[in-house]
Regions:
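Non-catalytic DNA-recognition/assembly elements of restriction-modification systems
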Residues: 1-28, 35-39, 142-170
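Short Ser/Thr-interspersed hydrophobic loop/turn segments at strand-loop and sheet-helix junctions
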Residues: 6-16, 32-37, 55-73, 105-117, ...
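Short, surface-exposed beta-edge/turn micro-motifs
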Residues: 27, 59-62, 85-87
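Short, well-ordered beta-strand micro-motif
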Residues: 31, 89-91, 139
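Short, structured beta-strand/loop micro-motifs enriched in basic residues and often containing a Trp
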Residues: 40-48
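Short, surface-exposed secondary-structure edge patches
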Residues: 51-56, 78-79
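A short beta-sheet element
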Residues: 67-108
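A short glycine-rich beta-alpha junction/loop motif
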Residues: 81-87, 122-149
Length: 170
C-alpha cells in the first residue's frame, strides 16, 4: 500500500459563488439533494469519457461537500449539474484510483476524519469546511487497484443495501 496526496491521483475543481451565476445556472446547481440522490442511486454508473468543463459534473466524477464533508459518485441523474462554492469536483485518475474506493475512503476512513479534525483545530466554528489547499494535500491510502475496486464495490453494495432497507422501513 502507498499513500498519495489527492492532487496526485485526481483533478480537483472548485465552484463559484451562486451570486455570480446566471439564473439558468442557479436552477441547475449541484446541492445537498443532488448528493443524497447520487448516494442512493441504484443504477449502474458509467464514468464519462468526455472531458467536461471544470464547472459541471460528469457521470463518474466525485462530488465532495466542503461543509461537513461527504462524497458521492455522480450519477447520470445529476450529471451536467453546475459546481457551486459548497462542493468540490474530483475527477479520479482511474489508472491510479477507483472512484468508489475514493468515495468510501473520503466518507468512512478514520484517517480522513483525523486529518479533518486536525485541520479544524483553531477554528472557532463547529462547522468544518475544507479548504482547497487542505483538500489537494489530503493523504489517501491506496492499496493496489484491484483491491480498491473490490473495496469500492463492497461499499457501493452497502450503500444500495442501506438505501433499500431505509425504503422498506418507510
Amino acid at each position: 500500500m502507498e499513500t498519495k496526496e489527492l492532487k496526485e491521483i485526481a483533478e480537483l475543481s472548485f465552484g463559484k459563488n451562486s451570486s455570480r451565476m446566471t439564473k439558468e445556472e442557479q436552477e441547475n446547481i449541484y446541492n445537498v439533494d443532488s448528493l443524497r440522490q447520487d448516494l442512493n442511486y441504484l443504477g449502474e454508473i458509467k464514468p464519462s469519457k468526455q472531458i467536461g468543463t471544470p464547472a459541471t459534473f460528469n457521470e463518474g466524477d466525485l462530488a465532495l461537500r466542503l461543509i461537513n464533508p461527504q462524497a458521492a459518485v455522480v450519477s447520470s441523474t445529476t450529471a451536467g449539474s453546475i459546481l457551486s462554492l459548497n462542493f468540490a469536483k474530483i475527477v479520479p485518475n482511474r489508472t491510479k484510483v477507483d472512484e468508489w474506493y475514493l468515495c468510501y475512503y473520503l466518507n468512512e476512513a478514520e484517517d480522513i476524519q483525523k486529518q479533518i479534525e486536525l485541520s479544524a483545530q483553531g477554528q472557532v466554528s463547529t462547522i468544518k469546511r475544507l479548504g482547497a489547499k487542505f483538500l489537494r494535500e489530503l493523504k489517501i491510502v491506496l492499496p493496489d487497484l484491484e483491491k480498491q475496486k473490490e473495496l469500492g464495490q463492497i461499499y457501493r453494495n452497502w450503500l444500495i443495501y442501506r438505501h433499500q432497507t431505509e425504503e422498506a422501513l418507510v
